[in-house]
Curated annotation (Swiss-Prot):
It comes from Human herpesvirus 8 type P (isolate GK18). Keywords: Host cytoplasm, Host nucleus. This is Protein UL79 homolog. Disulfide bonds: none annotated. The keyword Manganese does not apply.
Length: 257
């Protein structure tokens, strides 16, 4: 048992265990070895891809059989459509074509017929958000007829914004503490979704009785309390967000924290 409510499904490897303890002890990322940092970066990329595809599948299921643009676009921020517009311009689509409904319909049919173009448009959006690794979208999600609506709906999700923030500002001393804060949560989440850590159902009851902080933070607190590791208040070590941080985390007029 790692905590009162958390156990290992099988013993963690020495490397994973070392990383987990360093994160739980809130160690500065600059003290990690190069191999550890490369692995953490890989985990962040994997979590971004995993979260993106899970959210896209959720939206595709929710929007199945829906053709009403108002309904489909209900969760898509205007900022996303501006990125899509810029991406289409980069692909050579003129403003005149986008203003004509017939041209828009033909363009959408063309993009769906040429999945490579649709993937390229999605990659443009990711790059504008600072996510430059090879984002792998499951073919089933990519060929969904409502893909752009689905993608626009999920980009503001907290998990994707947190992972995207870490990837966009990876290696920047100015952003280290915020990257560390998000990377810690994402690493513990990775251990849970990969089946290495198994929270008990009673964890949620305990968390709800102690000022419910969220499932991942509840796991962190449980393990820390078991081993006597100090729990750091967010306000105690996180600086006030800079303009660059607020611009990224609030890019879609939402609260990512």
């Amino acid at each position: 048992m790692l905590g009162k409510y958390v156990c290992e499904t099988e013993p963690l490897s020495p490397g994973l265990r070392r990383l987990m303890w360093r994160f739980l002890q809130n160690k500065n990322l600059n003290t990690f070895h190069a191999q550890e940092l490369r692995f953490i970066h890989l985990v962040l990329c994997k979590m971004y891809n995993f979260g993106l595809n899970v959210y896209l599948l959720r939206e595709a299921t929710a929007n199945a059989g829906t053709y009403d643009e108002v309904v489909l676009g209900r969760k898509v921020p205007a900022e996303v459509w501006k990125l899509v517009y810029d991406g289409l311009e980069e692909m050579g689509v003129s403003s005149e074509m986008l203003l004509c409904e017939a041209y828009r319909d033909s363009l959408w049919m063309h993009l769906n017929d040429k999945v490579g173009l649709l993937r390229g448009l999605a990659n443009y959006l990711f790059h504008r958000l600072g996510v430059t690794h090879d984002v792998r979208i499951a073919p089933e999600n990519l060929v969904d007829g409502n893909f752009l609506f689905n993608l626009g709906s999920v980009l503001p999700c907290r998990l994707l914004l947190a992972a995207g923030y870490c990837l966009a500002f990876w290696g920047s001393d100015e952003h280290e503490r915020w990257v560390r804060f998000f990377a810690q949560k994402l690493f513990i989440c990775y251990l849970i979704v990969s089946g290495r850590l198994m929270p008990q159902r009673s964890l949620l009851v305990w968390a709800s009785e102690t000022g419910y902080p969220g499932p991942v933070e509840a796991v962190c607190r449980d393990i820390r309390s078991m081993y006597g590791i100090r729990t750091y208040a967010v306000s105690g070590y996180l600086p006030a967000p800079s303009e660059a941080q607020l611009a990224y985390l609030g890019a879609f007029n939402n609260n990512a924290v």
